[in-house]
Amino acid sequence: GCSCTNPQVTEGNDFYFRVCFIDPFQGTVMANYAYQNGAKNAAVITQLGDDYSSGLGSYFKDAFAKLGGSIVSEEQFQTNQTDFKAILTNIKAADPDIIFAPSSITTAPLIIKQARELGITATIAAGDTWENSTIIENAGADSEGVVLSTFFDEAEPANDEAAAFIKGFKEYLVKEKQEDIIPAVSALGYDSYLAAIKAIEDAGSTDTAAIRDALKNVEIDGVTGNITFNETGDANKDIAFIKTIKDGKFQFLTTTTVE
């Protein structure tokens, strides 16, 4: 897997491995970033019935509280909801330093624009799904300053493999006349391919059980960094990239860990 971040995906399935980090890690990383950058009060917005949104929001809340921060407002919204003024009004009254709102790329611009229309100046943050140019296109100038966590930064190649991938993918994007930004999920997809190929080579077979057993011991220097797998098939990763939207583009801010 390359983009499935819910921890339950690999539980009880010894044939499933993934190269991305998982939501408990991502939520903690974002809480650490927020607290380390001066946020003491946070609001959290999540979507009812959405495992990604509710799970990531919960992990952020727990980690932020453990650091000594206060969750001053918790709001939820329904699937397909487009008017967020009521919950944002509640949040404005709570006066948070940061709003953590893990949600879809369809919902994100609506939350961002309506928050700014209400005069909310708090930093708005989310997880990896927000690294999508659709948000910038639809939220416009209101998206400036949004912060998110992601798996990869093309400006900082982790190794020679990453540099070669970036060069090749950039050439492909130019050829196809697409936006010159490499999605993190594409880098993760490439790493999934590298891990699978290495496991097949190590197994010397295409037998599924043999490949599974080989994956348990695979180590690759992938586009998103060094990758090995733990006993549940999750990637052993200890770092996330924090990006912000500045001048209409996603720009690297820093790296953060769970420590």
Role assignments for model-derived ranges:
Residues 14-20, 46-49, 89, 148-156, ...:
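Second-shell loop/turn segments in exported
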Residues 19-43, 54-56, 83-85, 108-109, ...:
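Hydrophobic alpha-helical segments within soluble ligand-binding/sensing domains
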Residues 32-40, 61-69, 89-96, 113-120, ...:
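Sec-exported extracytoplasmic/periplasmic mature domains
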Residues 172-187, 195-249:
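Segments of small-molecule ligand-sensing domains
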